[in-house]
Amino acid sequence: MIKIGVIADDFTGATDIASFLVENGLPTVQINGVPTGKMPEAIDALVISLKTRSCPVVEATQQSLAALSWLQQQGCKQIYFKYCSTFDSTAKGNIGPVTDALMDALDTPFTVFSPALPVNGRTVYQGYLFVMNQLLAESGMRHHPVNPMTDSYLPRLVEAQSTGRCGVVSAHVFEQGVDAVRQELARLQQEGYRYAVLDALTEHHLEIQGEALRDAPLVTGGSGLAIGLARQWAQENGNQARKAGRPLAGRGVVLSGSCSQMTNRQVAHYRQIAPAREVDVARCLSIETLAAYAHELAEWVLGQESVLAPLVFATASTDALAAIQQQYGAQKASQAVETLFSQLAARLAAEGVTRFIVAGGETSGVVTQSLGIKGFHIGPTISPACRG
């Protein structure tokens, strides 16, 4: 029986939480899209990777409820709605509506929001979300091309996109221990709150969250809460996650569609030591030019003889991204680049490329779909510093 069933709103977020579950003792499988077959054997956690972060609300809720239905059929004990540690959901976003839909389907009157991931500098204090030492709305996330985050106070963000009141369980309460946290959660629920944002400044706070929420039918958050919950579930039988999911040998390629500040720094470094080619957005905008352009890029990748995998990137700085969006339109440009990466990945796979390193949630989603990958056994984390 699955102990934790995760419904993740994008591919990289799904992989991220799966790695935390494995790291903390739960054998885990990640599946792309709503499963239709039987449950994989010998696992304690299953992560369903959807592509619902930025799609229409109706589509996001329908897919999430379909994932929930499948997990319920497998006898899953706890449902975990996973979103980004930077929240990535405005007043018109999907986190609130999906959470409400899951709550209604599970007939639960109360749940929590815990996006904190201290190991990556995402902390929550008095309900305010910080990225490193900056408030969310003062970080690079304020320039996000799809979900610009201009408010840092999570209860206000939650209430703007959902159907109830949202309180806060402060770091001061967490310092008093798990019993104090349980009492505060009970108090908020008794006073008519539908949600609670959980402060977290340290991994110890996440461990307390996991202990306090061990029996909750539904939790929501980033990857951090999974640390505490996995340690609680793993204590039952001492299961150690198997070291599966090792990379294949063979030719590789790096595809980068993320425009985050961290990815910009990573791309700037990598292109100094490996072959790199920047995507020309203008050539992605029509079907005729896009197909020829994907073929051209595939030929370029296959022609490289460097020991390091060649890089094809659409990663752009804040100013460059703004110029692209102004010239072509944000939605049109984003979809065109995604289609390019999808076609490019398929062409490269057909030519024998077996290793794909992909940066960006949307990019990862379209690449895995184009490769026809249905699921993964999640192995050990190879580079904690690369988590997003």
Curated annotation (Swiss-Prot):
Gene3D superfamilies: Four-carbon acid sugar kinase, nucleotide binding domain, Putative sugar-binding, N-terminal domain. Keywords: ATP-binding, Carbohydrate metabolism, Kinase, Nucleotide-binding, Transferase. InterPro entries: 4-carb_acid_sugar_kinase_N, 4-carb_acid_sugar_kinase_N_sf, NBD_C, NBD_C_sf, OtnK. It catalyses: 3-dehydro-L-erythronate + ATP = 3-dehydro-4-O-phospho-L-erythronate + ADP + H(+); 3-dehydro-D-erythronate + ATP = 3-dehydro-4-O-phospho-D-erythronate + ADP + H(+). One of its GO terms (molecular function) is ATP binding. Its EC number is 2.7.1.217. It comes from the Bacteria. ATP binds at residues 258, 360-363. Belongs to the four-carbon acid sugar kinase family. Catalyzes the ATP-dependent phosphorylation of 3-oxo-tetronate to 3-oxo-tetronate 4-phosphate. This is 3-oxo-tetronate kinase. It comes from Escherichia coli (strain K12).
